[in-house]
């Protein structure tokens, strides 16, 4: 059973910020940046999000799953065998999602 998040949009934005920091980092190999940036979204609560944001999250998760579906990774090491192009596509999706859910300044 998962915990209910009081402010799901705030939580999502926090997770997205963390995911982008990981995605943009250069200390880890690309496959590990993908793995850890996706893990930042683990447990994300969609219930309670504004409908537009909810649709954006679902659309981006579908895009990630489409790429992952080529490989069907079961363990962390499986990400290492993914092509650099596919890994970069996932990182781009993560960053695009963060852009979509972050309020304009």
Question: What does each of the following model-derived ranges do?
Answer:
Residues 2-38, 91-98:
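Short terminal alpha-helical segments
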Residues 3, 8, 29, 42-45, ...:
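Serine/threonine-rich low-complexity intrinsically disordered regions
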Residues 19, 64-67, 97-104:
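Short, leucine/isoleucine-rich alpha-helical interaction segments at C-terminal helix-coil junctions
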Residues 4-7, 11, 52, 78, ...:
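A structural signal for alpha-helical segments
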Residues 1-2, 19, 61-64, 87:
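Low-complexity, intrinsically disordered short peptide segments enriched in small/polar/basic residues
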Residues 72-105:
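Amphipathic alpha-helical binding modules
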Residues 22-70:
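Amphipathic alpha-helical interaction modules
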Residues 19, 41, 78-79:
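Leucine-/aliphatic-rich long alpha-helical segments
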